[in-house]
Amino acid sequence: MNLNSIEIQKIIPHRYPFLLVDKIIDMEVGKRAVGIKNVTINEPFFQGHFPDQPIMPGVLIVEAMAQVAAVICMGSEENEGKLGVFTGIDNCKFRKQVVPGDALHIEIEMTAFRRGIGKAEGKAYVDGQLACSASLTFALIDKA
């Protein structure tokens, strides 16, 4: 299953400037997905991180991974309309800087999901090189 940015926005609540996944190029709902974030110099965070040497903040790489995980979970009917929130980030490692012009290739695999709590393993690559890896834990909650 492939999704463009319009279709992604029908599943998760994130919007510009905080929508950090541009498309899903492969997905098994509830199991795994591969997403792409095209990183451009026009990203608002590059104004201050860092003006003379723009680098995507690591926490936003992790957030991009979380958004792909949210698409996996909230793409199923039983989780439609829920809100995904972090409950934990473990074993997070940053291996490569992500800069304007990079295409962040995000691979997420769900490892557990019970009673609204999910766990996923995430990896983000640039040009085939590992940029970030992390274990993500989150809860799906009802919107207020």
UniProtKB/Swiss-Prot annotation:
Cellular compartments annotated: Cytoplasm
A Pfam family this protein belongs to?
A: FabA
- Which reaction(s) does its UniProt entry say it catalyses? a (3R)-hydroxyacyl-[ACP] = a (2E)-enoyl-[ACP] + H2O
One term under GO cellular component:
membrane
Q: Which UniProt keywords apply?
A: Cytoplasm, Lipid A biosynthesis, Lipid biosynthesis, Lipid metabolism, Lyase
An MF annotation (GO) of this entry: (3R)-hydroxyacyl-[acyl-carrier-protein] dehydratase activity
Q: Which InterPro entries match?
A: FabA_FabZ, FabZ, HotDog_dom_sf
Q: What is its EC number?
A: 4.2.1.59
Give the source's domain of life in one word: Bacteria
GO BP of this protein = fatty acid biosynthetic process; lipid A biosynthetic process
The positions flagged as active site in the entry are 49
Q: What's this chain's function? A: Involved in unsaturated fatty acids biosynthesis. Catalyzes the dehydration of short chain beta-hydroxyacyl-ACPs and long chain saturated and unsaturated beta-hydroxyacyl-ACPs.
Which HAMAP family does the record match to this protein? FabZ (MF_00406)
Q: Which family does it belong to?
A: Belongs to the thioester dehydratase family. FabZ subfamily.
Q: Which PANTHER family match?
A: 3-HYDROXYACYL-[ACYL-CARRIER-PROTEIN] DEHYDRATASE
> What is the designated name of this protein?
3-hydroxyacyl-[acyl-carrier-protein] dehydratase FabZ
Instruction: Specify the species.
Output: Alkaliphilus oremlandii (strain OhILAs)
